[in-house]
């Protein structure tokens, strides 16, 4: 299985094979997940001080904050999948 990388904004790249979900940060359960990840030192803030627009949860229980919309990240992920099928 080839490693697929996805840009999550500002030159930050994540292994697409490790992503479980991409969600919006507004709901209380997601805010709780972010706080728990911060407490466990499993939070990666890739927003460069900008507003968090997407929360990426990985299979290693890392939580990654991104300033890019969840739809944009999902589109980049889908585009990468389509390119690998060719």
Swiss-Prot record:
Q: Which InterPro entries match?
A: RemA-like
**Listed transmembrane segments:** none
- Pfam families documented for this protein: RemA-like
State the family it belongs to: Belongs to the RemA family.
Instruction: Supply the PANTHER family for this chain.
Output: REGULATORY PROTEIN SSL2874-RELATED, REGULATORY PROTEIN TM_1690-RELATED
Q: What's the protein here called?
A: Putative regulatory protein BBR47_37350
- Upper taxonomic classification of the species? Bacteria, Bacillati, Bacillota, Bacilli, Bacillales
């Amino acid at each position: 299985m080839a490693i697929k990388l996805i840009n999550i904004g500002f030159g930050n790249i994540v292994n697409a094979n490790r992503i479980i979900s991409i969600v919006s940060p507004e709901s209380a359960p997601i805010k709780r997940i972010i706080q728990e990840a911060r407490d466990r030192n499993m939070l990666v803030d890739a927003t460069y001080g900008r507003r968090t627009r997407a929360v990426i949860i990985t299979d290693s229980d890392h939580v990654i904050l991104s300033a890019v919309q969840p739809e944009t990240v999902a589109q980049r992920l889908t585009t990468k999948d389509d390119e690998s099928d060719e």
